[in-house]
A protein has these predicted regions:
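Electropositive, gly/pro-rich neighborhoods at or near active sites that engage anionic ligands
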Residues: 1-100, 228-249
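Long, charge-dense
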Residues: 92, 96-149
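Short gly/pro/ser/thr-enriched loop/turn and capping motifs at secondary-structure boundaries
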Residues: 107-112, 173, 190-194, 208-210
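Active-site glycine-rich loop that binds ribose-phosphate moieties when present
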Residues: 139-158, 164-171
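A short, gly/pro- and small-residue-rich
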Residues: 170-191
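Alpha-helix C-terminal capping/helix-to-coil transition sites in glycosyltransferase folds
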Residues: 70, 158-159
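Gly/Ser/Thr-rich loops at beta-strand to alpha-helix junctions
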Residues: 79-88, 107-111, 168-171
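C-terminal functional extensions of proteins
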Residues: 193-249
């Protein structure tokens, strides 16, 4: 993608870089019209977190990674914003887990799918990774959903037992949970339908959450915690934001 004009010394350089990635992705036809609105909403919650990864987010990331490692058929699901903001991190995590990536978007058009598949395969080649990227020929549907957004791959999302779906919409999250899957979401809004309905919710900015998981992968085996409480994680995320709001008042 093109160079960013902002200086790396800018205190919010990371945020400016993410905005730039979205601008470039939009030019390539990778994003839905509402993509920038969704990102801006997430940024507002990140301000309240102090743009940092909390202890509760690390707890959720560790549990998520343990479930992915122990899974029989883990899958990482990618939409337009995820590809633009953290495509490399998704591919590196998929490589470490030995699992496929499936491009699965809410507003599905042939043009967007072509752009997203092209981008992810470009990044895969640039990173020198051997990762299966699905999405070009869906051959199944997610029960409970209608229209193009229900399309998926049998060998990907449909057969998965544990699925990471960052920035997922509420309907699809609930449909995947109803299928009996362990559903992991990354969502800065602890009150969203996806965050509330998922099995594991990482309340953190996307690239930070994925980099946390990559660091944990390199650190050695993870252990599934049978006492993990997602409601407690959501509450801790919300409390961290309330503290941030009070401190900034």
């Amino acid at each position: 993608m093109g160079d960013i004009a902002a200086d790396p010394s800018h205190p919010r350089y990371a945020s400016l870089l993410m905005r730039h990635r979205l601008e470039e992705a939009a030019k390539r036809g990778m994003l839905a019209g509402s993509a920038l609105i969704a990102h801006g909403r997430g940024e507002a919650f990140d301000y309240l977190l102090g743009e940092r990864t909390t202890d509760s987010a690390r707890t959720a990331a560790a549990q998520a990674l343990a479930c992915l490692v122990e899974a029989t058929h883990p899958v990482l699901s990618v939409n337009g914003n995820v590809a633009a903001l953290a495509g490399d991190e998704v591919l590196r995590l998929a490589s470490a887990l030995g699992c496929p990536v499936e491009i699965n978007i809410f507003y599905r058009t042939p043009e967007r799918m072509e752009a997203l598949l092209g981008f992810m395969n470009e990044r895969k080649a640039a990173l020198g990774l051997d990762v299966v990227v699905l999405g070009d020929a869906p051959n199944a549907t997610i029960p409970g959903l209608k229209g193009p957004r229900a399309a998926c791959h049998q060998e990907g999302i449909l057969d998965s037992d544990v699925i990471l779906v960052p920035l997922e919409d509420g309907d699809r999250c609930h449909a995947l949970v109803a299928m009996g899957k362990t559903v992991i979401v990354i969502d800065l809004n602890p009150l969203s339908r996806s965050a509330q309905g998922a099995t594991i919710t990482i309340v953190d900015e996307l690239s930070r959450a994925l980099n946390t998981m990559l660091e944990m992968v390199e650190g050695g085996p993870m252990t599934n915690d049978p006492t993990y409480d997602n409601n407690a994680v959501l509450d801790a995320g919300l409390q961290a934001m309330l503290r941030g709001l009070n401190e900034g008042a």
